[in-house]
């Protein structure tokens, strides 16, 4: 298997990754239905940002250079190969203190109010998926009803939306037997699905990558 699958200790769950891909591109995760993960991490931009400073909510429903709306503080980082990084975001504010994103033994550290509360999750990317929906300028928006909610409250609203959607219940049921048997979709299940999709966004085997790893033969003319 791949280096990624060796470190995961299992094969990529393609069914779960496909579900995560759907959720990654769905504005249902934004409380005003006006932004998705892909709004700031666009596939047609190498899963990076089309803007010098990210635009999240209240946008003009365009992904690309003509996108308008309130700006965040920084450009959205690219999400390719993030599965291997022990620290995420430009200021490294999401971190696996073991130095390994696959290892939660040292805890996953986030700014308050999450702090170390997501350390029970199996990978740093699963924990990271808990954050964007709670950020007002990214996905939550500024409605007074939203501003009155804490982060867990916002995540509960997102989970309720998934549970109210028959197609999502069917798809989550394919990956989670408890959902198939009538249990509710939880936000953790969503986080696992999005992380599984991001596990597929690994691009580290170009000829230059192989050359850097010491494989010189056959690359003289590449």
Regions found by a protein language model. Give the residues of each.
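Periplasmic c-type cytochrome electron-transfer domains
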Residues: 1-222
């Amino acid at each position: 298997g791949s280096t990624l699958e060796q470190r995961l200790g299992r094969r990529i769950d393609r069914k779960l990754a496909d579900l995560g891909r759907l959720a990654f591109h769905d504005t249902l995760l934004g409380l005003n239905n006006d932004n998705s993960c892909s709004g700031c991490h666009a596939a047609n931009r190498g899963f990076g940002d089309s803007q010098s400073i990210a635009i999240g909510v209240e946008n003009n429903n365009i992904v690309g250079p003509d996108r308008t709306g309130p700006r965040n503080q920084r450009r959205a980082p690219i999400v390719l190969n993030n599965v291997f990084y022990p620290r995420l975001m430009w200021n490294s504010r999401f971190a696996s203190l073991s130095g390994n994103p696959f290892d939660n033994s040292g805890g996953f550290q986030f700014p308050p109010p999450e702090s170390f509360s997501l350390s029970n999750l199996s990978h740093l990317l699963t924990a990271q998926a808990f954050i964007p929906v709670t950020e007002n300028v990214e996905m939550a928006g500024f409605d007074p009803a939203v501003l009155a909610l804490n982060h867990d409250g916002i995540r509960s609203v997102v989970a309720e939306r998934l549970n109210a959607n028959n197609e999502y219940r069917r798809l989550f049921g394919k990956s989670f037997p408890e959902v198939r048997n009538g249990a509710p979709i939880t936000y953790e299940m969503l986080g696992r699905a999005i992380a599984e999709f991001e596990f597929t966004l690994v691009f580290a085997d170009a000829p230059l990558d192989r050359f850097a790893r010491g494989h010189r033969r056959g690359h003289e003319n590449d």
